[in-house]
Amino acid sequence: MFKNFGWVILFCTIIIGMLILYECKKHSRKSDSAKASFWAREARANTVRRKDISNLNYINIPDSVIPSDISDDEINEYRTTLLNLQARKILNLSGLTNTDLKEKYGVANLSALSEYDENYITLVNIIARCGARLIEIGNCSLAAVILEYGISIGTDVSRNYYMLAE
């Protein structure tokens, strides 16, 4: 009865090994295909000529969201940063990869667009921290103005929403 049991185990082991080998090769083919697709798209994106970016939806910081007449060192730092950002170009490019940016606007614009996106990231972080500090020092009305502005420009900082809800 147990005489053929060894053969059964050997047969099952071989079948399982072949299934594993098949799945590994299938995964490898898919991975190679995805890599080739990525690099082909990247190569196409690298050939796109510079496009006009002057008419993009740039974010402007209104004076009404810059805290003034508040004697708090932390708020003064945020004010300085906001004033510096006010003079710069700011774009919300969240959700776009470098390849997406190169395809849409050309390789030559990538560094400028990256800078504008970094300005946006700085802005939304400053808005969240400034709003939190204003709440700490009891200026909830100005905090609400700043946090609502953050939401209006598309911030995804969940803390803004929580602070406004409170």
Give the location of each predicted region:
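N-terminal alpha-helical interaction modules that lie
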Residues: 2-124
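TPR alpha-solenoid repeat register
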Residues: 159-160
